[in-house]
Amino acid sequence: MIPAIKINDIHKYFGGLHALKGIDLTIEQGEFFALLGPNGAGKSTLISILAGLIKPSAGNVSVMGFDVVNQYQQARQLLGIVPQELVFDPFFNVREMLRFQAGYFGRGPENDDWVDEILEGLGLADKAHTNMRKLSGGMKRRALIAQALAHKPPVIVLDEPTAGVDVELRQMLWEFIKKLNRDGHTIILTTHYLEEAETLCSRVGMMKQGEIVALDSTANLLNKFAAKKLCLTLGEVALPAKIKGMLRSQEKGVFTFALTDMAQIELVLSALRTANIKVIDMQLNEADLEDVFLSLVGQQ
């Protein structure tokens, strides 16, 4: 089967800045894939190349087998991209905007049933005849997602789709996107809400300084890189030097330690007993994708 996305040895220079350093990535049809990384890692540059907005300095990218540079129209026809920015045409209502967007890709009145499904799925049905300028910020975000889906592309890129939106919209959006994925659409997600990626995505790629530093299933990443977390309520105390290196975070007298093996629990408790520090409460938690992220790319 032809991959949904094939990225082969992509480099991108902006003057003297080497923004992408030999990215190799294959995303299969039907995947729900997360692309994660701190600001400046190169995610937006990679998405811009995928969308045909900028050209790579070296390497090639294809969408469903079509090269994004040499076969731009065919590749773009198969791709829907939800941008971070709220960019919209202020002169049309929501339905008009979606019909125009679909028309750019050769879709006519036969596409109206799909437009209705999008409007219903994203909670925009009662706003179909409302001018885009009059929508709230959250509704504009929904409309932008609908716009990316208007021509029914098989591959959908969601670039921070839930940034700055309320919980209700986030849940509605993910229910609709999960349905699209079940129906066969390939979903690529970038997000700073790591719990979303952990819950939704079957595979994760993590970027740092223009390179992919981890690429695996979510479960494998958790098993390989994440440590357990020991949370101790100690009050306002000074930790013994012996265990300071294991400290992940400290807030209001609660100290969180990263453990690479269970034997370290006794190491921590022994050091506290020796220092006459009383443990008020103790919890042992499983690691999550945020722990993997911090371990691999740092707290940037």
Model regions and ranges:
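Conserved ABC transporter NBD signature motif
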Residues: 59-67, 74-75
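Short, charged/small-residue-rich alpha-helical element at the C-terminal edge
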Residues: 227-300
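Conserved catalytic motifs of ABC-family nucleotide-binding domains
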Residues: 152
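ABC transporter nucleotide-binding domain
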Residues: 174-259
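Catalytic Walker B motif of ABC-type/P-loop ATPase nucleotide-binding domains
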Residues: 156-160
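Conserved ABC ATPase "signature" region
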Residues: 99, 103-127
